[in-house]
Amino acid sequence: MTGLVHELIYAGGARAPAAPALQDGKTTLDYAGLAGEVSAAANFYLGLGLERFERVAVYLEKRLDTVTALFGAAAAGGVFVPVNPLLKPEQVGHILADCNVRILVTSPERLELLRPILPHCRDLRALVLVGDKPAAPVDGLALAHWRDRQGAPASAPHRVIDADMAAILYTSGSTGRPKGVVLSHRNVVAGAESVSQYLENTPEDRILSVLPLSFDYGLSQLTTAFRVGACAVLMNYLLPRDVIRAVERERITGLAAVPPLWVQLAQLDWPAGVTEHLRYFTNSGGHMPKPTLDGLRARLPKTRPFLMYGLTEAFRSTYLPPEEVDRRPDSMGKAIPNAEILVVREDGTPCAPGEPGELVHRGIHVALGYWNDPEKTAERYRPAPGQLAGLVIPELAVWSGDTVRKDEDGYLYFIGRRDEMIKTSGYRVSPSEVEEVVYATGLVAEVAATGIAHAQLGQAVVLVVYDPSGGADVAARLLAECKNKLPGFMVPTHIEVREEPLPRNPNGKIDRKRLAGELAGLFEEAAP
């Protein structure tokens, strides 16, 4: 029985050692080779003093070493923390400090960018560098080289069970900095089992890994492939057309992406032969526009579309079967295998068909909570509705904060987000994190970041600022500072400068909802 994350790979090595497991460019590791790399990484970490449940952060672009570094941490009995390579040093520093990372795996080039923030990461003990470029040591930190992992002596891993921590994935909250969602081995493995079941994955599949591995959706492409003995093909793309070329060149059978990428892919020509091997495509991270779905289906007539909805806090929640797409193209579908999705009122009682309510996810996919954030964990992870009074220990469920409705047949439809998160390009962006960068410039007196509907992005990040000085170049200066301090997906698409204070709600806070309403039609002409 496979119960631990890394055992997905080990099981493949035992079952079909010569089968291709992981490909990056012209280099392919079979399952035996990948299992050996994961074991070598685990021994390497243990030799560096990694203790049970200690965190290993990996801050690299997508490559073979990234995958083995992540799964090797789990195999050692530690916890892996994939860090989005698009993040800026200050954001990486927050993650390293917040979850008390002990070992950081990165490149010499990225290390140079991180040097100013490393003194603030007080739990960090060792740096592991991937690449041959020399790097100066950092005071107080052991410096090791990834190339030395094969020489590490074999060590017994720390004992863990499937209920223990496996990974921490960082996702933005509605207030403050990104929060770490703690996933157990059971969460990750069960997610792979559920997804591979409804996608009907087999060892013959070749799944293109386009999304960041710091996304649960991106990580899922690996675990789903490993669960069935398929091959995951890694890709760092520059242009949407590169994705199409990779699908054709590598004879990809499964492709996952977020709506902004699908919007672009639906506007391009696809080679005629692709549909002969591309079995399915999946969408999550936001609603796929109907014109985009229609465009993809016209270009890929034999490829089955799976429209999904998920929470990092519970992996994946729902999917719409391809045979229902024509009847219910706006639906989120129903619960994935081994999960139950409830729609409830504020008092926890079930909603009637058509009645809006909060989506609550219960089952094996529910994560362990937010790292180092008991208040947010208590808010989001609460007893599941409708439990029997005799249960002494209540089952916890994820209360999503999303408003949905269920039709007479049990299919779900998304209505809106109850918090103020901005969902852009498949990312969740905290308004306050963007606002902090703007306030730090000292250029404006007030700022509010909000998400405005956008045909390509899902939502666009929009800033409204109050500048009493009336400076003519404030918007340009703020945009330049945001580009310098924030990853691309957090940079505002539009900045509106006002000469009067921003509107307030009854509590004296800036009224984001009012601002969002005023700007609701800002991007209507951007629709394809």
Each PLM stretch: what is its role?
Residues 189-206, 213-254, 268:
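Conserved AMP-binding/adenylation subdomain of ANL enzymes
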Residues 30-33, 159, 166-190:
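Conserved AMP-binding A3 loop
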Residues 130, 487-509:
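AMP-binding/adenylate-forming catalytic domain of the ANL superfamily
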Residues 111-162:
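ANL superfamily adenylate-forming
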Residues 2, 18, 151-170, 177, ...:
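Conserved pre-ATP/AMP-binding loop-to-beta segment of ANL
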Residues 87, 104, 247, 255, ...:
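AMP-binding/adenylate-forming catalytic core of the ANL superfamily
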Residues 227, 249-257, 266-328, 340, ...:
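Gly/Ser/Thr-rich phosphate-binding loop
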Residues 2, 10, 18-63, 67, ...:
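Conserved AMP-binding/adenylate-forming core of the ANL superfamily
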